[in-house]
Amino acid sequence: MKLRKQNILIIKHGAFGDLIQSDGIFRTIKHCFSNVNLTLLTSSSYKDLMLLSPYIDKVIVDDRFKFWNLKKIFRLINEIDTLCFSHVFDLQNSQRTFLYKIFLRKPTWITT
């Protein structure tokens, strides 16, 4: 019997250096959870680079729209929600990601 892979979301916006320093966290999560797909939520400027990481399976772009642009924000939340993540590692821990936490189905949410 083949086990279904868990989906885990990692949220990391921010500067290039911060994202590169997070690579060790990506590696650790990938090794601690067996049979897992790691998805990274980050800015569009880092998408192509992060897809080169052997630890990241998918990248979802979050261009951090203004809070009054609810249509785009909820479109992103819906995209995230359809992937049914079992865990979310929130490395950003911001007001924006707190908003995501409120509206997403209830995965296990881990913040820094």
Regions found by a protein language model. Give the residues of each.
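Catalytic machinery of carbohydrate-active enzymes
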Residues: 1-112
